[in-house]
């Protein structure tokens, strides 16, 4: 589902093919300049610029942006790998080259800030979205990479970005592994 911006929580603007959003010339022509300005901006301007960009729910189509309004899961999960969360990763700017070797990675490109990556992975059991996320978190952690916990949210928005060196694999393998999601309870 395509939403007007990252603050939108109501109805989507329309449905869209993910490939058009990621690499379509229409979005690039309309929003590339804004993304470039965002990447060069100071903190004050970034929030304003970010809310002027469209966003999609990679993991599904929704009548409204909440998990109860999921119409259909896309069979995809999107994870974020941020440089700030991975200070020990040598040559972070070349991480996409390593990620592209992973057979189940369908897409890897720079996030809007240009200092992190978002990775799209086909999953075997959409109804186990969080369990797939947990398994991916564990797999990447074993490689010394921390992924942002926001990927476990099926309603998570992906703000428009572009990457001239994005990795695209339309024949990516499906990620099968799941792991139990641990719930931590706190005393009341």
Where do the PLM segments sit?
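Short glycine/proline-enriched loop/turn "hinge" motifs that connect secondary-structure elements
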Residues: 67-72, 100, 108-113
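Short beta-strand
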Residues: 107-113, 148-153
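Hydrophobic, Leu/Ile/Phe/Ala-enriched alpha-helical segments that form helix-helix packing faces
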Residues: 35-42, 99-103, 136-144
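A generic structural motif
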Residues: 115-122
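DNA replication initiation modules
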Residues: 1-7, 63-87, 123-188
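DNA replication initiation on ssDNA origins
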Residues: 1-75, 184-188
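Sequence-level motif detector for i,i+2 pairs with an aromatic at +2
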Residues: 51-53, 73-76, 103, 114, ...
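Short amphipathic alpha-helix segments
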Residues: 86-104
């Amino acid at each position: 589902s395509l939403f007007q911006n990252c603050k939108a929580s109501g109805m989507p603007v329309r449905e869209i093919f993910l490939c058009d959003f990621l690499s379509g010339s229409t979005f690039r022509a309309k929003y590339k300049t804004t993304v470039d300005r965002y990447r060069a901006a100071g903190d004050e301007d970034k929030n304003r610029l970010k809310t002027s960009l469209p966003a999609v729910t990679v993991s599904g189509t929704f009548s409204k942006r909440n998990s109860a309004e999921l119409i259909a899961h896309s069979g995809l999960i999107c994870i974020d790998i941020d440089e700030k969360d991975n200070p020990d990763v040598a040559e972070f700017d070349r991480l996409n080259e390593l990620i592209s070797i992973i057979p189940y990675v369908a897409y890897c490109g720079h996030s809007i800030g240009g200092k992190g990556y978002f990775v799209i992975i086909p999953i075997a059991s959409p109804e186990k979205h969080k369990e797939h996320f947990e398994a991916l978190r564990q797999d990447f952690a074993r490689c010394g990479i921390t992924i942002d916990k926001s990927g476990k949210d099926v309603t998570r928005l992906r703000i428009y970005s572009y990457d001239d060196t994005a990795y695209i694999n339309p024949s990516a393998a499906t990620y099968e592994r799941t792991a139990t999601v641990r719930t931590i309870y706190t005393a009341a």
